[in-house]
């Protein structure tokens, strides 16, 4: 069962909204970033608790070791940060300075 307040669900809802607005390319990039992070975490239901400085550092290292370019890594990190910040705004995730 999908957690309605989890990180993955928050990302999916935002991706749906982007598609409804006709922002298909942006939705595609968010979907790729979310999918990649889900694979890294080993679950399609990533929780906000799994988003830590250490997990993001390891994820960046994982992407680099798998041949992704720095531009792609930076883009994916921005997408993840954006999803996390939406969770903070909705009250589903704690604010963590310099996450």
Regions found by a protein language model. Give the residues of each.
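N-terminal DNA-binding recognition helix of tyrosine site-specific recombinases/integrases
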Residues: 36-40, 49, 65-99
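Basic/aromatic-enriched alpha-helical hairpins
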Residues: 2-66, 85
């Amino acid at each position: 069962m999908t957690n309605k307040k989890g990180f993955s669900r928050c990302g999916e809802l935002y991706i749906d909204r982007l598609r409804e607005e006709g922002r298909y390319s942006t939705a595609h990039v968010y979907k790729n970033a979310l999918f990649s992070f889900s694979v890294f975490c080993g679950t399609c239901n990533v929780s906000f608790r799994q988003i830590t400085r250490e997990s993001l550092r390891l994820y960046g290292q994982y992407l680099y070791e798998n041949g992704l370019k720095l531009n792609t890594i930076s883009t994916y990190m921005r997408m993840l940060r954006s999803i996390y910040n939406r969770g903070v705004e909705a009250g589903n995730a704690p604010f963590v300075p310099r996450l």
